[in-house]
Amino acid sequence: MTKEELQERQRWPLHQKVDHTLGVIDQFISRMNGNVYLAYSGGKDSTVLMHLCEILKPDILCTFVNTGCEYPSIVKFVRKMKDEGHNIRIIRPNMRPKDVWEKYGFPLVSKKVSHQINLCRCDLQAGRPLPWYVDDPKSFYKIADKWRYLFHTAYNTNDHCCHVLKKEPQRRLAKKLGLAPIIGVMASESNMREKDYIRQGQCNSFDEECPLKSKSLPLSIWTDDDVWQFVKERNIELADIYSKGIRCTGCVACGYGCQFADDTRLALLYKLYPKLYAHIMNYENNGVTYRQALREMLKVEGMYLPDENPQLSLFDLFDQSEL
């Protein structure tokens, strides 16, 4: 598949995407003999996908990982959905976020950059030269000069937290139950997901040798606007955190993307859950706090943590109607 072909599918009207998505889910359920589950986050995308999956398999198992780093509003909403009859199982990881960051390092800049930073740090510490692609301007994995200070910091930068806190608990349960995942991600969310979809060429991937490695990404060709349109047209209930300005309901203090001027995740956390914000800012790696690491990352872009900005108040960060 080409990028142009993906973009053509992304321009389909919503009703066509819904039909396509139901076909994708139906094919996956059939090929897997019904042995499937929905990786449920409690966010808008996976809530829309839950409603679509339940059209074809009303009793589909939806697994929610309470990582300990979720918005309280999301956890409350998931429990409400469970109480209302959705087949939701709430599970937990084996480690707390605090312990994961202390052992592996902080999630900074982006998943791709933090992964490459960690690999490069390992090479440098072992006396090996940096991989060629780090400096190749044509390489997808080139690391921008402004982030190379992370090669030498006292604290580690790593993308391992997502694996430990989210993916591993899901996989462990799926292996125990013999189920393959349906996941609510979209190609439009990142360059990496776009490249993955173009390479795959379709929403479903099947592994004949190890069926549990098969997976379905039925919302791949959807956009954020499609999700909101579907929510409005079908009157889908969402967690109330969305009415308070949040756009992404992942881990509350994840450092991925916080360096962008339009990212208000940390400001919202500080505004809505100040005690949780203060608690997470004190997480450590190698004796350095998350606050210190974030402060250094934001400084690269001339930005500040929401409680350290000398020029802004909360009234500057949000519409006064939201406060």
Briefly describe each language-model feature range:
Residues 1-226, 233:
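ATP-dependent adenylation/nucleotidyltransferase module used to activate substrates
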Residues 2, 210-212, 224-323:
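ATP/NTP-dependent adenylation/nucleotidyl-transfer catalytic domains that generate, transfer
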